[in-house]
UniProtKB/Swiss-Prot annotation:
NCBIfam families cross-referenced by the UniProt entry: dapA
EC number: 4.3.3.7
Family: Belongs to the DapA family.
Cystine connections: none
Catalytic activity as recorded in UniProt: L-aspartate 4-semialdehyde + pyruvate = (2S,4S)-4-hydroxy-2,3,4,5-tetrahydrodipicolinate + H2O + H(+)
The protein's name in its UniProt record: 4-hydroxy-tetrahydrodipicolinate synthase
Gene3D superfamilies in the cross-refs: Aldolase class I (3.20.20.70)
Family annotation (Pfam families): DHDPS
Predominant localisation class: cytoplasm
Keywords, sorted A to Z: Amino-acid biosynthesis, Cytoplasm, Diaminopimelate biosynthesis, Lyase, Lysine biosynthesis, Schiff base
GO CC, one annotated term: cytosol
Keyword Lyase: yes
Amino acid sequence: MSYQDLKKCKIITAFITPFHEDGSINFDAIPALIEHLLAHHTDGILLAGTTAESPTLTHDEELELFAAVQKVVNGRVPLIAGVGTNDTRDSIEFVKEVAEFGGFAAGLAIVPYYNKPSQEGMYQHFKTIADASDLPIIIYNIPGRVVVELTPETMLRLADHPNIIGVKECTSLANMAYLIEHKPEEFLIYTGEDGDAFHAMNLGADGVISVASHTNGDEMHEMFTAIAESDMKKAAAIQRKFIPKVNALFSYPSPAPVKAILNYMGFEAGPTRLPLVPAPEEDAKRIIKVVVDGDYEATKATVTGVLRPDY
């Protein structure tokens, strides 16, 4: 699995990591969560990303998680592994380990956080990772979390690398439009912003790497189908109702809101690991009313987020 398999994926879910109350991974909860996603239009799954609370996972835990999910998925959809850190050497070592582990269409490597590298430093970081193994690399560009932004010009330099096959772009629609217009033919562009998915797909993006697909996969699929069928009136109507739900999902540090909803739905998502904490009970109730029930009064009263949330 690689570029061709991922090209078919419109909705890639950034999978949560289910935890027990003591903070250990709840491997028994994984099968039901996976089957739920696949029943509601998830086309691919990202493991050990931000939504999985990857900063709190050891590499050994990530490998255990990979094995557990691969066993359940059994090749039904492509999988992407989170492989990047702000340490190039550590990223290289883990990318090699994941490549040897097998079963992944690609690895997702984040722009280095905290170090604040230059554009050339970021270019060399990703080039070196991509050179290190035959695992295809997708770049994760999210300046709201990492402080620095990989510019479209640097991204296009990296897009020429044969082992860099795409980007999860969380900057602006202007940057996304530029990348779509100038990218190599076999280079995937996903938005990482659920609220931007409508606009990104209309610009020509390949899909979304999503948190909302844990809970709202059906309406996302319906919206994407309407776009593909050029029914903009229907797609826009879905988007108008979808935006408040996205804002609710990011009204508290993610993935606390989506975990609260999944727990409410009967899935054992469990708590978050520190330094993240669960959403307060009253906030969680209001989030559930918006995302699950589409409660208009709850939306008016409590959900005042933005199209591109901070979290």
